[in-house]
């Protein structure tokens, strides 16, 4: 990974809500409502941050009937978050 790519990833993860969302999704995939309950923030805020994470290729949605579940798909992001947890 070059510095430009690393900078883009770090910029996205630089927001505390997005970092918390990614951390939660690393533990287990979940839908918007579960994230709202876990983080105690408005659904619209969670949806905005999920869209940004999805647009950057950090998370992917998966449909389960009418529910969309999200999971972290970028291993570089997983490594970064693991380092930050230490």
PLM regions: where:
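Conserved segment of winged-helix/HTH DNA-binding domains
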Residues: 2, 68-86
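Short capping segments at the starts of secondary-structure elements
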Residues: 16, 26-31
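Pre-recognition alpha-helix immediately N-terminal to the DNA-recognition helix
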Residues: 19-21, 79
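Residues within the alpha-helical elements of helix-turn-helix
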Residues: 24, 38
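Helix-turn-helix DNA-binding motif, specifically the short coil turn and the N-cap/start of the second
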Residues: 31, 42-45
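Alpha-helical residues within the helix-turn-helix
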Residues: 37, 48, 54-55
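Beta-hairpin "wing" of winged helix-turn-helix
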Residues: 54-64, 71
């Amino acid at each position: 990974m070059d510095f430009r790519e690393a900078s883009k990833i770090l910029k996205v993860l630089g927001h505390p809500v997005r970092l918390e969302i990614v951390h939660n999704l690393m533990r287990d995939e979940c839908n918007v409502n579960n994230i709202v309950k876990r983080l105690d923030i408005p659904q619209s805020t969670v949806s905005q941050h999920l869209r940004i994470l999805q647009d950057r290729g950090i998370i992917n949605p998966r449909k389960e009937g009418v529910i969309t579940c999200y999971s972290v798909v970028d291993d570089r992001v997983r490594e970064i978050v693991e380092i930050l947890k230490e």
